[in-house]
Each structure stands twice: as C-alpha cells, then as structure tokens.
Amino acid sequence: MKLYKVPIKPISQFATKLKGDTLFGQICWAIFYKFGKEKLANLLEKYRDNRPFLVVSDAFAMGYLPKPKMPSCFLKEKSEDKKMNRKKIWLTLEELLNGAYTQAKTDKEIKNGDKEDITIHNALNYKTFHTGDGFDPHGLSVSKLDKKDIFFLLDEEQLKFDEFKDVLELLSDMGYGKKASVGKGRFEFDKDEIEEIKLNSNSKVFMTLSPFSPKGLNLKNIYYEPFTRFGKFGANRAYKNAFKKPILLADVASVIEFDKVKEYQYLGHAISGLSDIPEYSDTVHQGYSIVLPLKDLV
C-alpha cells in the first residue's frame, strides 16, 4: 500500500469535524455514485477481511501532525509547564519521527486560522412563513478552516490512483458532512500537489492518525483518549433510521507499544453490525488507522 498526503483548501464552512472515519464513509458514497454499487460491494468485502483498499486520516494543520497522546514523561516535558504543554499540539513529520516532542508548537505559533462559531436557526412553517407556536431556535456549530493535510493509505491493486483522485474530486464537489446540501463542507485540492510519503514502517511504537479500534491486538501498552462515535447513515440511507449504533474508539494520536519490532502501515479492523435494519447489514465503519513509527519509549 502507498501513503499519500493530500493538501486541501476549504472553501466553505464545515458543520462536521474532518475525522478519518467519517471521511472514509463519505468516500464510499462517492465510489458508489462514481463507479456503481458492485464496485463498492467488492471493495468492502475485502475490507471486512482485513484487506482495506483505503485508510483515511483525520485532517491536520498543513505541514504538521498531532503530538502523541501519552504521558508527559515519555514526551520529555517539564511538569511545571503542564498548562502550556497542553496547548503545544503540533509537530512536523520529521520532529515526530525523531522523537523531538519538546519542539511541539501551539496553534498560534503555526498560525492556524481555524475558527468555530455557532449560528442560530429556527424552524419555519413554509405554509405560513412564520415560526409557529413552538418557537424552537437551535444552534449549529460551524467551523471556518485553514488549509489542511489529509493522509490516505491506498491499495492500488483494488482502487487505482486515478480512480482515487476522481472519487476525491467528486467528494470535494458534493461537500463533506452535515449540511452539505446547502453548501457546507466544500474544499479544493490540486491533483499535482498529491505527495507520496515513503517511511520505514518498522518500530516497537506507533502513533495513529485517526480514531481506530484496538480490539484483538497483542499489545504491550496503549496510550489513548477514548472517542465515542455516534454515527448516522447518509445519502441514500438517511431516511429509514439514520442513526447507527454507538462505537467506542481510541482517538487520533493514540500510541501503541509492542514487545518486539513490528512492521505496520495500519492497525485496527473493520467494524460491522452498525444497524438492526436487515438491508443495512453490509455497512462497515473504518476501525483502521494509518500508523506512523515512533522512537522507543524510554
């Protein structure tokens, strides 16, 4: 499998966070629309059998990756600087691979321009063009995002590189996440700026680039923050019962330690059984994550 970095430029507000597992689901729908149901079904059949055609990372500040979520003693951080260290969350790829965790920077230092806001909405009766008796205002959290990097681990024997680019282009036009039908979640990317990242994948310690399921792994240690995904069906499946069963995952930047040196490009497994609706039994969730090799923990 080949690891690619895709720089994107958001061109509208986003109402859903750019998380790898959600991105994967949206890409599956783009494959469905671009290449048909049979193509997607064949890809997902192998995906369930620990042969993922694609693993997608979260979106990160351009040129940076998240600091590993592990105890400060492994990060060589001073306990008296605990408050400041919590804000230092970004490392370059080189710093991360070399274990230079004390070089981590804050959003302000890297000039990350992400901004989150709440927009207030109200239900409108389109017959009367009034709000009605209930007066039910609600807030929608939206984000204005700076340029991002997203990593994709692609098996080109299953999904060709040109097919992947076409699918990503379709997704960028369709929009990502909540409220895409009214213009949210749009982004641009230049196909010529897609970069292949070549790494030595041998290590005892790895860091994840998206939420994943560590179930079944023979680990020495794992350091993580829990993340509960309350998923919803989208596109053609959003109308019967949109809600999926909750999934407990280890969030992005989890650190996995093994007893011996291993070679991994990704860890985790596909997650099924997300709905009791029989015709939705083929649904799978990305429980895989791209992993990067770290220095041994001392």
Give the label of every model feature segment:
Residues 1-298:
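Conserved active-site/ligand-binding neighborhood in enzyme cores
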